[in-house]
Amino acid sequence: YQGIAMGNKDSKQVYLTFDEGYEAGYTEKILDVLKENEVKAAFFITAHYVNTNADLVKRMLEEGHIVGNHTVNHKSMPDLSLEEIKKEVMDLHTSIYERFGYEMKYIRPPKGEYSERTVAYCQSLGYTTVMWSFAYDDWNEDAQKGESYAKKKILDNIHSGAVILLHGNSKDNSNVLAECIQEIKAQGYTFSTLDQFER
């Protein structure tokens, strides 16, 4: 079904993606860091996110990032009927299109939960399912393990074709992002976007 989880192992491209369920005050800094380092990323947003942070979504788009669908209510897709999935995906799709004139085409299943049925159905709706090759426990705001932990986790898991999943609500990530990007580039990697994805 042409889903994306890991890119070409022989090509030194890496892909940076963020999941944005709600805003904790760090996304502006993340966008600043990406801009300063000339890196384009993908941000997967929920309806709650765009309804409360339309200005940040607008900035993501204006600065050339991909905005992806993380569904209206962040429900596990395998539990839903096709009709419910369609609503979860397309209501957000329509909302983003009406507000920003932007047609989303990548989806990240809530909680990373999917099945062949959901991936195939999302494809029929015009969506490529995007998973990841690396994620870590950065999403829990109450259990941030420190910047050196975050940096080590990220840098230890970089490889050709890596699809990196970070959460926009992580204070540690936002603080070490610039250092990580510079270190990854120094190791000879290029940050590519999902639009340039190499299988």
Where is each model-derived feature located?
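Active-site beta->alpha N-cap acidic-glycine motif
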Residues: Y1-L80, E84-E98, Y102-M104, Q196-R199
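Conserved, mostly hydrophobic/aromatic
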Residues: D19, L34, F43, V67-H70, ...
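Alpha-helical scaffold elements lining the catalytic groove of polysaccharide deacetylases
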Residues: A24-K29, K75-E103, E113-S160, N173-E179
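A generic structural signal for well-ordered alpha-helical segments
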Residues: L34, M60, C122-L125, I184
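Structured helix-beta-strand junction loops
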Residues: N37, E63-G64, L125, S160-G161, ...
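Short secondary-structure boundary segments
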Residues: K111, W132-F134, H167-G168, D195-Q196
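Catalytic cysteine-centered active loop of the rhodanese-like fold, especially the PTP/DSP P-loop
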Residues: A162-G168, D172
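Low-complexity, Gly/Ser/Thr/Pro-rich intrinsically disordered linker/tail segments
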Residues: S170, K185-R199
